[in-house]
Amino acid sequence: MCEYTAKDYKKGQPRWCPGCGDHFFLASLHKAMAEIGKAPWENAVISGIGCSSRLPYYMNTYAMQTIHGRAAAISTGAKVANPNLTVWQISGDGDGLAIGGNHFIHAVRRNIDLNMILLNNRIYGLTKGQYSPTSPRGFVSKSSPYGTVEDPFHPAELCFGARGRFFARAVATDAPGTVEVLKAAMAHKGASVCEILQNCVIFNNGTHDSVAKKEDRAKNAIYLKHGEPMLFGENNEYGLMQEGFGLKVVKLGENGITEKDILIHDAHCMDNTLQLKLALMEGPDFPIALGVIRDVEAPTYDCLLYTSPSPRD
């Protein structure tokens, strides 16, 4: 078997702004592909329109930048036409969840074997700073000078609502964490949704500051691993317990609480109730969940299409 390095997947000179989160993600994608070990020509990277959607230009794979919001549709066609191809769909929060929102939920619902990467910086960057479907209520932008009056989408809710079987989250500045979820997405057979939290240094700088730096992630984020207790903090001194139908943060050692009392993460549970609660956690009361939150098996559209009986049989 031929061994590949990140360099084998690189192409061209990225033209994003210095410090843009896209640089971090691109490097992680190159590294993940090398570790996965599939040849460049066994991969296709397909995007829509936006800053992050320039990514195919920097991939030494089959690559295509398509039209606004249609990355999922084109990716579906590529995967159905060639099931042996590994397809990476790249979308920003505006491209993927506004004009491309319907394509997004139906690709997830159909469980097409796509690696669906959502680069979420909570802003329209290419068009110079309008609020996006993931911008928080009250967000001030060029298109909302007095603050938005809308509640944002939570990508996890859309994925779970479309009966998604895989959802993971990483921070672009955390290369090991990003590579880990990309490899897990590749290993999963079906629609794999990965939300990547990243910064836009020009129009929404600092939007994910609470988890952007390693020293802050220890206290503001929790890395979920299947089969392991849900612990976080600089010394894993905090954990998650169930309280009624919800969750609560506890400190080990207080009120007799030990590690045995902490919930164990089950990414493979078919019932997504607890997984969704984890995915929706936000600061300051809860840590932001990172890692593979849901990963369950189900037949894929592209497989069933070729194995189901047809009227001609």
Predicted ranges, named:
Residues 1-125, 179:
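Thiamine diphosphate
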Residues 12, 39-43, 81-87, 109-115, ...:
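Short coil/turn connectors at secondary-structure junctions
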Residues 49-51, 121-123, 174, 197-202, ...:
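Glycine-rich beta-alpha junction loops
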Residues 132-185:
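Conserved thiamine diphosphate
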Residues 165-217:
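ATP/pyrophosphate-binding catalytic subdomain of soluble kinases
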Residues 196-289:
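Internal helical hairpin/lid segments
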Residues 306-313:
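Conserved small/polar residues in nucleotide/adenosyl-binding loops
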